[in-house]
Amino acid sequence: MTLMVPFKQVDVFTEKPFMGNPVAVINFLEIDENEVSQEELQAIANWTNLSETTFLFKPSDKKYDYKLRIFTPRSELPFAGHPTIGSCKAFLEFTKNTTATSLVQECKIGAVPITINEGLISFKAPMADYESISSEMIADYEKAIGLKFIKPPALLHTGPEWIVALVEDAETCFNANPNFAMLAHQTKQNDHVGIILAGPKKEAAIKNSYEMRAFAPVINVYEDPVCGSGSVALARYLQEVYKFEKTTDITISEGGRLKRNGLMLASIKKEADNSTSYYIAGHATTVIDGKIKV
């Protein structure tokens, strides 16, 4: 196919351009999904060379507002956090929808409920499953990161498979310098996408504030500037560690080492049926608005 279709590049988890994590969003809402091949979508994502490129399609069912497909330069993902928020922002602009307060995104992992409140876009994590890891694996990851962890790390299934580890404080997290070759080897060997490193901001005015970093060298993302699925993983991990008994908000900063200033708002919500859900919210701003030849 050779078409000119609407295209946006959206900066996510920031209100100020160039300070968050960009996602390319391509509007295929007027194109049947079977008109474009997997190979064509992958080629576009490879060319944009962003951590993720997304494609908006018509949903398969009326219970959804749109279908989203998410690609890295190498492969398709079942779900990702910052592309979900950035693509929602783009969808609202593409469709000139200024009044929506809730949407449902269809993606490979299933339905993702989204709310919009005065520009703040929030999604309910479709999955956040916790799994313990062996002491040998913990030692290997400590060696790769070059730090001792203050709590046993764990594997979090949030779409991507993240190891989550806590260090003493935000400064320790910020100053970490992983051995990326060793980390890539460990994550490839264990079939993990990477590691989420976090440290509490002990002097912060806001309770439950954390500095976070996301390392995924095995997929050529040495450090993700601001990672939505990673923030889901961190929130779920903190719930497992600290056993919050009521709804708890977590403020997560990320990107400082990359000269970014991302801000994510996580909510560990206690539902009426006594289950626990995880929500991630953030702002997004469109930086590029035009067309792309596909």
From Swiss-Prot:
A Pfam short name: PhzC-PhzF
Q: Which GO terms describe its biological process?
A: biosynthetic process; endoplasmic reticulum unfolded protein response
Residues annotated as catalytic: 52
Species, as recorded: Saccharomyces cerevisiae (strain ATCC 204508 / S288c)
Q: Which Gene3D superfamilies match?
A: Diaminopimelate Epimerase, Chain A, domain 1
An MF annotation (GO) of this entry: isomerase activity
Tell me the null mutant phenotype: Leads to defects in unfolded protein response.
Query: What Gene Ontology terms describe where this protein resides (cellular component)?
Result: chromatin; cytoplasm
Q: What is this protein called?
A: Uncharacterized isomerase YHI9
Instruction: Tell me the keywords, alphabetical order.
Output: Isomerase
**GN (gene name):** YHI9
